[in-house]
Amino acid sequence: MRVTSPEIQRGIKVSELLDMFGSTAFNARRLGEAAKICEEMVKSDSFVFLTLAGAMIPAGMRKIVAGMMQNGFISSLVTTGANIVHEIVESLGIGHEIGSCYVDDTALAEESINRIYDVFVGQEAFERVEEFLSGIIEGLDGIYTTYEFLWEVGKRIPDERSFLRIAAEREIPVFCPTLHDSIAGLHMTIYRKNLQIDFFRDVSRIIDFCFQKRKMGVIVVGGGVPKNFTLQAMLLAEGFDYAVQITTDSPQWGGLSGATLEEAKSWCKLKPDAKAVTVYCDATIALPMLYAYLLDRCGES
């Protein structure tokens, strides 16, 4: 099969462009392969995890995550405490501002503005989050998994487009193994009375999912704890059938975010014949394109 140049025409769909990428090279081809694997995941009725590391919510990816839940493209989300906090910031109508990385950060601090590369968020946003969460935390009694606690949070979020609210309404588990490593964790430490979070029950539940009699898939955005928490659950099962990883890290430094999916096969986290591809690309580019592809090719799952 020859490499062919995409024939770009006015009105082309994202799905058509990604199909053309499949006969190009480098990471365009990898992104085209990822689209096909994601399509097969959904159409085969696989149980699909989305793992989300990095500052994806401040970067504007919340509606992509929510849409993937609403359309049945993902079955569970595994993410960081930071992304949860920033989703609450968005859900309360505060939001994040377009900023710049070429600024005087000391001057920003004096104005109570926090910087996430080229995104700004005011300190008052986190004060609003504290006000919102404190009432929930103080009112809960007993032992919860992270996803059960986040369902309670989601039930109280007014924004219908919030992925936390959608997850609560549909009982989609949102695992957050680093919930305590976030501003939300600080608030829980301060305000909890009889509330306890059982992280080990999270592990038991995600392992249960991995033993289902259906195909299993994972879309890995970045790496870190969400990636490891999800892949390690397969150590006791048979391994994932499908896997797509979007990362900007490379493997030779030995870090998990750059570890290839082929390496994961040595741990039996992926089946030997698993369909898998790693796309080296900014996830804020690749993830929306994959979502648009699935909308066109799969509709509502």
Swiss-Prot record:
EC numbers on record: 2.5.1.46
Residues forming the catalytic site: 269 (nucleophile)
GO cellular component: cytoplasm
HAMAP family linked to this entry: DHS
Protein family: Belongs to the deoxyhypusine synthase family.
Pfam families: DS (PF01916)
UniProt key word tRNA-binding: no
Protein name, UniProt field: Probable deoxyhypusine synthase 1
Known pathway: Protein modification; eIF5A hypusination
Cofactor(s) the record lists: NAD(+)
